[in-house]
UniProtKB/Swiss-Prot annotation:
Organism field: Halobacterium salinarum (strain ATCC 700922 / JCM 11081 / NRC-1) (Halobacterium halobium)
An individual GO BP term: protein transport
Record lineage: Archaea, Methanobacteriati, Methanobacteriota, Stenosarchaea group, Halobacteria
Protein transport among keywords: yes
Function: Involved in protein export. The function of the beta subunit is unknown, but it may be involved in stabilization of the trimeric complex.
Gene: secG
Name this polypeptide is given: Preprotein translocase subunit SecG
Keywords in alphabetical order: Cell membrane, Membrane, Protein transport, Translocation, Transmembrane, Transmembrane helix, Transport
Membrane topology summary: Single-pass membrane protein
């Protein structure tokens, strides 16, 4: 990539940050700990299924 070209990566990243940073009051609010707990639960279910299969 030549030093004269600007790929616009920084500008597009700034747009994504602005898009994902906006909070919608009507959006479903999920606690991050709940997501981790559900993922750990399903992981445990898969491990137990492999152990008993």
């Amino acid at each position: 990539m030549s030093s004269g070209q600007n790929s616009g990566g920084l500008m597009s990243s700034a747009g994504l940050v602005r898009y994902f940073d906006s909070e919608d009051s009507n959006a479903l609010q999920i606690d991050p700990r709940s997501v981790v707990a559900v993922g750990a639960f399903f992981g445990l279910v898969v491990l137990l299924a492999q152990f008993f299969a």
